[in-house]
Amino acid sequence: MNNLVVNQTVLPDISKPKWDQGTYAGRAKHFFSSTNPLTLFSSRIQQEKCKEIVTNYKTGVISPTLTVDELWKAKTLYDSTYHPDTGEKMFFLGRMSAQMPGNMVTTGMLLGLYRTLPGVVFSHWFNQSFNAVVNYTNRSGNSKATNERLFVSYCCATSGAMTVALGLNKMVKNSHGLAARLVPFAAIALANAINIPMMRSNEASEGMELKDENDQLVGKSQKMAALSIAQVTLSRIAMAMPYMVMTPIIMNRITRTAYYRTRPWMQKYSEIPIQTLIAGIGLYFTTPLCCALFPQKSSVEVEKLESSVQKEIMSRPNPPKIVYYNKGL
């Protein structure tokens, strides 16, 4: 009975994550929860029930039988299913919980179809198309990233990845070992370096929104926008590095074993399934662990901002000494 929400001296604050976001461990726990692919299998009834619980709780309507654990479970499913700004149900392939299975499939294709021109073109087109769905689904409700900008970013990232993949393939065409297998990672790293800055070019030019402790807008900073874009790009590349580097290394070792070499059917049919499985195991850990590298809501002292931004903030009544910004994912 003590676990009932109505019996709590201090009610749980579901406007913030359950775990302390000031520590890496707390952020990792939060992202392990929010990227859990099992939430994709929840029914429409379960999703609507969780939405009702969360919506009612925010307005002060609390069921007398609702437990703290049930509240947090409802919040987890609600956050993974509904857009945080619009409240609309997100397309299931674009949800963060679809990152592991979605990237698992695309990685298997990237690592298994790297030898031929059609394979390279199709796998990188498929991968960037999946990324575009994720970016579009998770765009901010107040985002100024237009459909045109999303499309241009998608085209540039896709063409960049294909160009690098085909160029490096030509350089290592006489190599059938590890060097050729690592080409997809180099292509993906460049695609992220193109896609993310282009997607957020509006923030880079106009500045990232800065808010005080009361969530009131107090200014915009190009410096923090550049830092945030760099952090997100780094975390995306770091997310891909373990499974896109280790998977080829493991597969390269497997192909050299006598067991593999003496079984032609394995050489013909098993490479993509094996690499997909290995990548999936890696993705289960790298997705939340790399999303947690940097705090999503970060703070900065006003005196460390650009001089023009400092003047703007200090001209306000009771100006804050510390401001906050959302770096994004």
Swiss-Prot record:
Classification via InterPro entries: Mtc
GO aspect biological process, one term: serine import into mitochondrion
Transmembrane segments: 100-122, 150-167, 178-198, 232-254, 274-294
KW Ribosomal protein (keyword) present: no
Any GO molecular function: monoatomic ion transmembrane transporter activity
Reaction(s) catalysed (UniProt annotation): L-serine(in) = L-serine(out); L-alanine(in) = L-alanine(out); L-cysteine(in) = L-cysteine(out)
Subcellular location: Mitochondrion inner membrane
Pfam families in alphabetical order: SFXNs (PF03820)
Keyword Transferase included in the entry's annotation: no
GO CC annotations, alphabetized: mitochondrial inner membrane
NCBIfam families (alphabetical): mtc (TIGR00798)
Family: Belongs to the sideroflexin family.
Protein name as it appears in the record: Sideroflexin-1.1
Source organism of the structure: Caenorhabditis elegans
